[in-house]
Amino acid sequence: VIDALVFSCDRAMQLDGLLRSIRLHRVPYRSLTVLAHNWRHTDALAVVEAEHPDVRFVAVDGALPFENEVRWFLATHDRVVFHVDDAVFFARPDPVVLSVESAAVSMQLGRNTVWCRTELGGEVRQKVPPGLVWRWRDADRDFGYPLSINATVYRTEDLLPLMDFDFGNPNQLEGRLHDRRERFGPEWMVCSPHSSCVSLPHNAVSPASLSPRGDNPLWQPEALRERFMAGERLDLGAMDFSRVSGAHQEIPLVFTQAVRV
């Protein structure tokens, strides 16, 4: 049983796309919670909430409420996965792989993910392990990064001992978990032959964000919000996921008017 927590901030178009992709591909989550952090455009958030009545939405402002909600989520669930709202599923993850509890299970990695996006926005080729189960301490780049907050499944009993730190946003949470990776209990990571989820780093909601992002002005948060409020949605069926080769990839966005899946 897996419970999911989605981190979201002012990206209604992308959040809606992620939620619809989870439903479209029958991702087997028991529950789905969206932690909406520091949203300015609450009208857009209200639309997303109305269109996804089966999802729990929690809106918080500030660092401490964010941390408290994450800790409460971890304290009340046994196996969890985090998502950031710029990701989408393009295939159904293998339920057998997801059932592995003794390892960190990545839905963003596979034999197809031969490229790793760097902190400067470029891409470098990474060594893919020969098998679908590998020791992350011996692996390269994304395959040696066990504590991602993007589509990796954990037991909370493995996460909670690491969380002896304060954090106020998803970047701080991931960075400080990564700093403590040598204390992470599971030695192994697991994935399917092909990834099923990909992050689409077309934009960032904070000018202070150091994460690389795309520069297409039509795909920045404000432009996408206007299109979303005008009734447009990501057309998941028309987007081309046939050449996914990394965990993060700027796959072109395609839109349709008020699509529902």
Q: What kind of feature is each model-predicted range?
A:
Residues 87-98:
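Acidic donor-binding/catalytic loop of UDP-sugar-dependent glycosyltransferases
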Residues 13-15, 39-47, 96-97, 114-115:
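Short, charged/polar "capping" segments at the starts of alpha-helices
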Residues 35-79:
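Active-site-proximal specificity loops/subdomain of glycosyltransferases
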Residues 151, 157, 161-261:
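C-terminal catalytic/acceptor-binding lobe
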